Amino acid sequence: MPDDLLNSFMTGPDEKGRFGDFGGRFVSETLMPLILELEQQYEHAKTDDSFWAEMQDLWTHYVGRPSPLYFAKRLTERLGGAKIYLKRDELNHTGAHKINNVLGQIILARRMGKTRIIAETGAGQHGVATATVCAKFGLKCIVYMGATDVERQAPNVFRMKLLGAEVVPVTSGRGTLKDAMNDALRDWVTNVRDTFYCIGTVAGPHPYPAMVRDFQAIIGKETRDQMMAAEGRLPDTLIAAIGGGSNAMGLFFPFLDDKSVNIIGVEAGGHGVNEKMEHCASLTGGRPGVLHGNRTYLLQDEDGQILEGHSISAGLDYPGIGPEHAWLHEIGRAQYVSITDREALDAFQLSCETEGIIPALEPSHALAHVCKIAPDMPRDHLLVMNMCGRGDKDIFTVARALGWDMDGA
């Protein structure tokens, strides 16, 4: 990567919400006033000490932050090579990184006088986090979830309902995250007066990509401090799984200007990155286009129609990527690779067997890439992987994929 590309990689987006050629706000006239109001509210909140004091109090006493930075000793010994640390965001309240961001958005929603919260969800973790925070603050919660994901993420559907949320199965398209987001946007257009759309990833129209990144950046900030305390220096490599890319952006962002730190995002390779598009690796196998209010890399056909893609992981089953990731890819600051379903399943089992940690299928993709590269690294190479979610929600999917009979277990 050329040293003279930029003075800083942390100044974006610009006033139009763009990261280079990516991002922006491609929304209907009905939504534009709400988007501009949200941007104004967030710009004010960013410099409001009372906002961040409330966030820090909730992160500490409700979420349970800071999450540990854990040296995976047996995994390191099994693989040889790099010294592997796991950022344990699966230990957060609700079991994933999603609640870091949801708290911030719902505090903003309350400041804006909104009483009805809508959200999209794939793996269900963002839906659970949104339902959780809505229950805490007494807000109405509606979660849009693809019908396919409702079936494969049944435990999280039940959790959302227990928390008082209305779960709306989306049957259009292939019934996955893209379709859930489409229906959530349609709801928002219809109910702009009292409704706040709590987006779960670093995608969507500006200011969402930057706002979600800023709320998730607590992951990387903690990691910097914890690594300095544990090793006396910064990590050499960061690795995180990428669907829309919020957990990865949260880990990566505080390190973007540290050019000694290698950054790797891991996309869902599905059945393999090929012309059949049986994957969700939009950076590896897609091209630029516009979806859900922003310009980014997408899986699309020759006519620009969005393709469905595939991943065993509901949280990575999205045919796009956050615009800041698209920009980092194009300028060469971060590297993006893909991992197949099979490789992720193998890594899922390895984590269980070596560390006693049942990972979600999303970070299992990141772990699979760790398994590929760690053995060839020197023993003093410090590698940090974000364990962004726990695998309780995925045990039935994994059992089916491995041919295990859960009824006879």
UniProtKB/Swiss-Prot annotation:
PROSITE patterns: TRP_SYNTHASE_BETA. It catalyses: (1S,2R)-1-C-(indol-3-yl)glycerol 3-phosphate + L-serine = D-glyceraldehyde 3-phosphate + L-tryptophan + H2O. CDD domains: Trp-synth_B. InterPro entries: Trp_synth_b_CS, Trp_synth_beta, Trp_synth_beta/beta-like, TrpB-like_PALP, TrpB-like_PALP_sf. Pathway: Amino-acid biosynthesis; L-tryptophan biosynthesis; L-tryptophan from chorismate: step 5/5. The keyword Transmembrane helix does not apply. The modification N6-(pyridoxal phosphate)lysine is found at residue 98. The keyword Metal-binding does not apply. Its cofactor is pyridoxal 5'-phosphate. Keywords: Amino-acid biosynthesis, Aromatic amino acid biosynthesis, Lyase, Pyridoxal phosphate, Tryptophan biosynthesis. SUPFAM superfamilies: Tryptophan synthase beta subunit-like PLP-dependent enzymes. Its EC number is 4.2.1.20. Pfam families: PALP (PF00291). HAMAP family: Trp_synth_beta. Tetramer of two alpha and two beta chains. The beta subunit is responsible for the synthesis of L-tryptophan from indole and L-serine. Belongs to the TrpB family. This is Tryptophan synthase beta chain. The gene is trpB.
